[in-house]
From Swiss-Prot:
It comes from Neosartorya fischeri (strain ATCC 1020 / DSM 3700 / CBS 544.65 / FGSC A1164 / JCM 1740 / NRRL 181 / WB 181). SMART domains: WD40 (SM00320). This is Protein transport protein sec31. One of its GO terms (biological process) is protein transport. It is found in: Cytoplasmic vesicle, COPII-coated vesicle membrane; Endoplasmic reticulum membrane. The COPII coat is composed of at least 5 proteins: the sec23/24 complex, the sec13/31 complex, and the protein sar1. sec13 and sec31 make a 2:2 tetramer that forms the edge element of the COPII outer coat. The tetramer self-assembles in multiple copies to form the complete polyhedral cage. Interacts (via WD 8) with sec13. It is a peripheral membrane protein. Component of the coat protein complex II (COPII) which promotes the formation of transport vesicles from the endoplasmic reticulum (ER). The coat has two main functions, the physical deformation of the endoplasmic reticulum membrane into vesicles and the selection of cargo molecules. Belongs to the WD repeat SEC31 family.
Amino acid sequence: MVRLREIPRTATFAWSPGAASPLIATGTRAGAVDVDFSNETCLELWDLGLSSQDASQELQPIAKIGTDSGFNDLAWTDSEDNSRGVIAGALENGSLDLWDADKLINGSSDAVISRMTKHSGAIKALQFNPKHSNLLATGGAKGELYISDLNNIANPYRLGSAAARADDIECLDWNKKVAHILVTGSSAGFVTVWDVKTKKESLTLNNMGRKAVSAVAWDPEKPTKLITSTPLESDPLIYVWDLRNSHAPERTLKGHESGVLSLSWCPQDPDLLLSSGKDNRTLCWNPQTGQAYGEFPVVTNWTFQTRWNPHNPNFFATASFDGRISIQTVQNTRTDTARAIADQNQALDGADFFAKAQTQPQVSNFSLPKAPKWLERPCGASFGFGGRVISVGLIEKGKRASKIKITPFEVDEAVAKSTETFENALKEGDLRSICENRASQAASDEEKADWKVIEALISENPRKGLIEYLGFQDQADETADKLAQLGLDKEDDEVNGESAKESRGSGAKKHKRLQSMFDANPEADNFLSDLAASKGAKTNNPFQIFNGSETEADKGITRALLLGNFEKALDVALKEDRMSDAFMIAICGGQKCIEKAQEHYFSKQTDGPNYIRLLASIVGKNLWDVVHNADLSNWKEVMAALCTFADDNEFADLCEALGDRLEEQIRSTEDKSLRKDASFCFLAGSKLEKVIAIWIEELREYEQKSIETAADDTSFSIHVRALQSLIEKVTIFRQVTKFQDTERTKDADWKLSMLYDKYIEYADVVATHGRLQVAQKYLDLVPEKHPEAEIARNRIKLAMRHATPQRSQQTVPTTRTPVNKPLPQASMYPAQPAFSATAAAPAAATTAPRNPYAPPTAATAQPVNPYAPPSAAATQPQTSNSYAPIGGGGYTPAGYQPLQPPTYGAQPLGGSVPPPPRASNQSPATVTTYTTATNLPAWNDLPEGFTKPPTSRRGTPAAAAATISSPFPNQSPTLSQGPPPPGAPPTQRAPSVPPPPKGTAPPPRVTSPPTNLPGPSPAANPYASLPQSPPMGSAMGVPPPASIPRGPSPYNAPPSMPPPSNRYAPSPAAQAASPQLSTRAPVPPPPHAAASPYASQPASHPPPANPYAPSTPPPSQLPMQQAPPPQAPPSRPSTASSQRKAAPAPPKYPPGDRSHIPSDAMPIYEILSADMQRVKSRAPSSFKAQVEDAERRLNILFDHLNNEDLLKPNTVADMAELARAIQARDYETAKTIHIDIMTNRTEECGNWMVGVKRLISMSRATP
C-alpha cells in the first residue's frame, strides 16, 4: 500500500461524486486544535492531482470559504442544477449549510445555497440518499433526525418524536438497495432502522448491553445486513448484523486495541471493509468471513474517519487528529523490498554508518488474498500473437471458477487463403502456371507486364524468351516481305538455263529466310566442286597472272598474295579503297586482317546509315555506346541487341544502365507509363534492388486507388492483398533468377532495405493469421543485424516455443510472511554440514525460470523457529563432521546458503561439541546469515516505476552480508580460518534475541550504536567470486607438503575472504591471486587427514542459472572417511622476519595500458572488448553492477596480456580462438575452450577467467 497524497488538515472530508478527477472537500473538525492553536473554521476543496506521479509537493486548496463553526460531517452529491454537485456540511452549531461546488471553485461570492437551523444542537452526521440524491438525512443531538429535500430545503420533516429518546444520534446510513430504509446509531447504544416512507422506526437491534455506537454501514448488496462499531476503549468491537435475526450479531470482528470511530463498506466489493479508531490504526477486513486482511500505515493520533472513493475504489482516504488526511491505494508497492535495497546501497565504511538509520514513515504491507471485485471480470478476451484469441469465461454463473479457451483468429480470411495457396504452389514448383495465373488476374497493365517478363525468364534460354516477349521473333520474315515489295529479291530470268521460278520448285514459299532462299539443286551443289581442278585436269580458260595492263596496286596485291602476305595485300586494297576486295582478302588472311578491314570500313562510314553504327558496336563489342546513346523510343531494339550480343558478364549492368535512363526520363517527363519499360530492363538484368522501388511505388498507388473506389473492402484488406502480390512477385523472381543477396552480413546501408521492411511487415501479417513458419521463412531473408527483424524473429521463436533469451522477471511462488519479521539470530559457531560416504550431489531444487539478467536468487529456507539458534541442515547425514565451518557448500556463493534453524528445544550447536583449536593468528570463522526474500510480487502490485524507491545519499553498490576479516583495508586476510579453541571465549558474541514484537512496530528511531559491540557485518558481494572448494584427495591419501602453498581456486576466491571495508581497496580475490601477497606461511594440514576437515557444506538448493552470476563448477568428490579433529599448529615465534610482508612485484606496465599487447594476443583484446561494449550498451540498467564487474575482470586479463605474464603462449592461442568463437556467436565452442583452460591450466587462471565466463553467458543472452 502506498500513500499517494496528504492533505495537511485536521478535518472531516467528503469525496467528489462522478468519474472526473477526484476532488476532496474538507471542513475543519469541530473540537480539534491545530498545531498553531488557530480557531479558524473553513470549507476547502482540494485537487489531488493523482495523474501526476510527483507526490513531493504539498497540496494547496483550490477553493476556500469561511464558516461560523466547525464541522462534524460532510457530504457531497450530484445535482441536476449544479454541474459539480452540492456540498452539505453538518456544523457544530446545529446549522446545515449547502454550497455549490462549481461556484466555490470559480471563487463566486454566492457559493452558499442555503443555511438551515432546524436542529437544536450539533448535527453529528448527515448523508445523501444513494438512490434519490435530493434527499438528505441529518442526525444530531437530542435524538433529532430530519429528512430534507433539496428542492424544498426550508421544510424538512422529522423522524421520531422528541419525547421518545434524548440521546445523541452519532451516525446514520441509507440502505443501498431499498431507498426508503435508514439506520441510525446513538450514543446510548440504540441501533434503529427507520422506514422513511412511513416515517416510523421498523426495529431496534439488541446492541449487546446498549454500548455506544460510533458508526453504522449497510451491506452494499444485501439489504438485510449491516455493521456497527463501538467507540469504547475497553470493548473495541465491530458487529455484523442480519436483520432477519436482530437479537444477536451474526459475527464479531476483533482487531482494534481501542475504540472504533469510523467504518466504510466498499460499494463495489462487499468483501472489503475499512475501519479506523482510537488506536491510530486503519484496518481492512472481509466482513463476510471475519478475516482481517491487514492494516495500513499507523499514525500518531486517532484516525476518526475513513472513506472509500465512491467511483474508484482503488483509492480511499483516512483523516486523523495528527493533522493529516492521507489518500492511499489498496495496491502493494513492496516497500520492504525497497527499504532492503536502500539499506544495501549504503556504503560499507564508517562514514555512512549512522546514515543507515532510515527516517522514512513507517508503512505496512499486506496482500489481499483475492482480487477485489472491481478487478474481476466474468469474461474477457485478448488477441494473442500468432492468430489466437484467448477468452476467459465462467464455468457456471455465481462460482469463482473460469475456463480458458484459445481459438484461432484471422483478421481477413482471404489473407490466410492466398498465403496458403501461394506456399503450396511454391512447393509444387510449377512457377510458370503461377505466373500465368497472376498475369491473368493482374489489376493493372504494369503488374501484368511484370508477370509476363518473369514468365519469359523461366524458359531455358531467358534471352530468347525476352526477345520473343519484345516481339522480334518474326522480324526476318517481315523484312523479306518488305524486300519483295521493293523488288530487291528479283533474280535473272534464268539461272544456268532455267527460270528462277522453276529452280525454286513449285511448292516453295515465295519469301523465306536467307538460308532457305535457294532450293536444293544437284547441279548447283556440284558447281564449286567442278571449279576445283583435280590432279592432272586441264581447263579451257587460260589466263595470265600479269598481262601488262595491271596498275601498280594490282601488281602489289598480286605479288603479296603470291607470297602469302595477306596483310600487305589488305593494306594496298584499303589504300585504293577497294573495300570488296579488302574484305575478301581479309577473310583469307584471318581474324587480324578481318578486324583491320572492319575498323577501316567503319571509319569510312561515319556518316553512313544507322545500322552501320549498330554493326560497329556489335563487332567492336561496345554495346555501352548503344545503351547510352540510342534514342529511348527504340529501347526495345536496344534490349533485343543486348539479349542477342551482350556478354554474360556485362548483360546485367547494361540492362541496369538502360533502365536507369528510362527512370531519368520518367522523372523528367513524369510519364509513369515508362515504369513498366524500366521494370522490364531491371528484371532482365536481375536487378532486384532497382525494380523493388518501382514495385513499392506501384503498390502505394494501387492501394490509394482501391481505397477510393472500393465499396466493401477495408483498407487493411486492400493493403494486405497488395503486399501479398508484391511478396509473390519478389519470391518468384528470386527463384527464377536464383538471386543471391550478398548484403545479409552487413550491419547497415542495405540496398534492399525497402524490401526488408516489406518482408518484416508481411511476416507480421501472416504471423497474425497463424502462419508462423511462413513468417519465419521471410524473416530469414532479412539480415541478422536488422533491428526490427531481430525483434520479430525473437517474437516468432517464442511463439513457436523455440529457446530464446528471456528477459522477463522471475516468477517466485508467493508465500505469506508476517508484517514484522523477527531478525534471525546469528551464531558464532558454524552449522554442521551433512557429509556422505559417496560423492555428494546437490538436492533437487525448484528453480525459477531462467533470466539471463536476474541476480542470483537465494534458496528457500525452512521456516521452523525464527528465534532459535541456527543448526545443521534438516537432512539426516550419514556421517557428520562437527568441525566443518559454514561456507559456500557445493560451490554456492557466500551469502546465499540458508541457515536451517532447529525445532524448539534444540541445543545451540556452539555448546554441543568443542571446536578444534586454531592458530594464534587465525580469525574466527565467517558466519553466514540468511534473510528470507521479501520481494515476492502479488496480484495488486503497482506497475513498475509508479513510485520512486528510496535512494541512499551515496551511490554505493548493494552488497550481501559477510564479515570483515581484517580491520586494515590493504592487509590480505588469511586463507584458512577456524573457530576459537576449546574452552576459550569467542572473540565476538552475537547480541541476544529480542522477544517477538507485539502488534506493529512503532516508527523507527535514530539511536547511536553500542561502542563495544561489533558493528553490522557488511554484506558479501553477490557478484564476487565464489568460495573456494578445498582440495579433495583419496581416503587414505598422504597430505601434501607444507612447503608448497596452494593458490586460490581457479573458479572462486576462498570463502574466508570477504570484501574489504574500504570501498577503494583492491578486491580480496585480486590480492590473493598472487602468492607474494600472503601474510603468513601456509599452515600444513593435520596429520593422517584424508582430506581437509574444513570442507564446504554442500548446498541443498543450487541457485538458478544466471549469466551474470558467478560460475558454478560441479561438486567435488567428498572424502570417503571422516577425518579426526585437527591439532592446533604451534604458534609461530614473533620475529621480524615472520611478520615482514612480501613486497608484491610491480607490474611491467601500468593498469589500463594496452599499447604493449603482442600481435598474437591483440585479437583477444579487440574482440572481447568490443563484445563487452555491445553487451554493456544493451543490458538493462538494473544490471549495471554485473556488467561492470565482468568488464573489470576482463581488464585484468588485458593487463596480463599487456605485461605478457601469467598466460602461456598456448593459452593465449586458445583464448584467441575463444574470442573468435564469441565473435562468430559460436558459444558452445567458446564454452568448451573455456572449460578446457579452467580444467587443465588452473595456474594461469584468476579473476579474469570468471569475467570471460560471464561474457560468454551475457553475450549469448544479449540480442
